Amino acid sequence: MTALLAFVVIYLLGTLAIGLYAGTRVKTATDFALAGRSLPLIMIVTTTFATWFGAETVMGISAKFVQGGLNNVVEDPFGASLCLIFVGMFFAAKLYKMTLLTIGDYYRKRYGKSVEVLCSVAIILSYLGWVAAQITAIGLVFNLVSGGAISVETGMVIGTLSVLVYVVFGGMLAIAWTDFVQMIVLVAGLAIIAFMAGDLAGGPNKVLDLALTNDWFKFFPEPKLHDVLFFVAAAITMMLGSIPQQDIFQRVMSAKDAKTASRGSIIGGLCYFAFAFVPMFIVACAVLVMPEEAKRLLADDPQKVLPTLILNHMPFFAQVLFFGALLSAVKSTASATLLAPSTSFVENIYKNLRGGLTDKQELFAFRVVLVLFTGCVLTYAIMMRGTPIYEMVSTAYQVTLCGAFVPLVAGLYWKRANRYGALASIVMGITTWILLLATPLGEQFPPQLAGVLMAAAAMVAGSLATKPHTHQAHEAGHPEATSAPLHGHAHQ
């Protein structure tokens, strides 16, 4: 075992111990899924920031930046940061006050079980690519720090198991505790690495000159309709498509009060936006420090540019810092993306099939499904080996953008929105997206933009085509009953 690998193993065991200790405090399903709705502001900020700052931020976005500038990363970090800010501004307080366990519960309360199940399925499926990206990154880390002695696939299995153990025992509470520690390691580690990389490159001014020379600060597209449409589509994919995601919802709902939920999400988004530029700066330094090697890697395997700089051009302690920071980023995101779909499946699909569960039965079901989902996504990640990390992640959010975003917004902000409108929105949004994705039409007009526009149109048409329910007793019991269809209650 190399010294670097030994440090990585010690770090993994340390975070595992923290997670397991936190797990001793989990007594109920709410403790497991939402950390008992008790987290202070600092933990909401760190766990929100941690969820976003994953493998794609460290290795994916940074490589995309030096390949095409800011225009190439509009989706993440620009769209991703605004997503968290929008959640804090427009969604967190409203959803927190409803005391829900999952985002799927909102769809059931607002529109009924059919919408709950459809939106939950879309949300769960969207996690496949995101979790696969984190698992792939974990495998790559083990492969690199072992000098190739551990294959990427074996590393994927080891890393996934190290995350699974503490999430199974501690749920959201374990994630919040480990995220707090891991974000300290991440921020400190990458900040020191950035300082050292800048020094190797000849100072920040040289890096800035390189960026200006290569036009890397160009943000807006060419003034052509095709380019503008695809730019807008890329921006809204994570900006809006991530809003109805269970992992964000869990962090919002885990706060001790509504104000903390809102502030935590906004601050987390601002922190993410600021710090996402650090890996970009480091990779820009790599282009100056090792120009020929960086050029070759950018053409063959862009995700390895940053790790190669660290391994070949920096001292041992810098390598420990970097891989500690990288593992922190990957593990925090992986833990969140394993827990979120598992809780959604149990709460919004399994319970509908099986019927009512006691609190203990639900807690047990959360853990069993978590293990099963992890096994499935690990298999999927191994099968998808070779797909760029950034692409895995960006595709994931298109599902929820087209299927779940419009019903969420309309339900919160438009009283006339009803079950029929929501069903029409989901069906038309997803169908349009798939149609364009599977045909040459998708090269002319972005599939996700077409999908969300059709979803919005279908929501309006479907809701207005059905008269609102105005029965006085029904309205008295259900404040939002005016949005229910004439011949159907919202809880059917």
Predicted regions, residues:
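Membrane-embedded helix-loop-helix hairpins and adjacent transmembrane boundary segments
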Residues: 1-492
